[in-house]
Amino acid sequence: MSLHLCPCQATNPVSGLRAGVFGWLREDLAMAYSAFITEFLREAKVPRLSLKDPPPDERLIAKAAEAKDREITGEENSNVGCIRSLLFLVAGELDQAHRLAQEIPTNAGSYIHGMVHRIDDDFGNARYWFRRARTVPAAAEMYRRAAAASVTVASHPSWDPFAVSDMVEASRIDGVSDELRAVLTVEFEVLLEFLCKTTED
């Protein structure tokens, strides 16, 4: 099953990644997700760089709000709060994403909390919550995929959310590169995949 966010214009030199208007997403990830999430991601524009890039999608926000927990995950999964928070985040509803993340006392909850503040340009707060996460969920896989798409990520010995925050902060002045979009898409997809496959972080 292929996962397309929008009509593909080109293929990334990194195997398995395809380019769309808003970034990169591997085509084989549908196997990791429930039917609800797979369909949600087909309609979403990933990654989210800021509240306005891409614009919030009110229809997807409503879908994330109205779906039952079991509908989202397809089975019992204690990470459903984190998963719903990520769906709100990518749809552009930061208040709901923040509300859910701050109520979840896990590494994943803290990490998503940091992602929300990073999107909202509150970089100091983002770094605080990345530190609170202690360990990054699925960090090794996040690094493996992102390093293949980014010289900047590959220059570090492991996944570094602070370095990624620096990249995002710099993009507010220098503009958003395809490299940054690829890195943020990998971050989102690996974290979501991890949460869907496990029941705790």
Per-segment meaning from a language model:
Residues 17-30:
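Short, Lys/Arg-enriched N-terminal segments with co-localized hydrophobic residues
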Residues 10-11, 19:
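Ala/Thr-enriched low-complexity intrinsically disordered regions
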Residues 99-121, 138:
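Short, charge-rich amphipathic alpha-helical segments embedded
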Residues 28-103, 132, 136-201:
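N-terminal alpha-helical interaction modules that lie
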Residues 6-8:
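Cysteine-centered motifs
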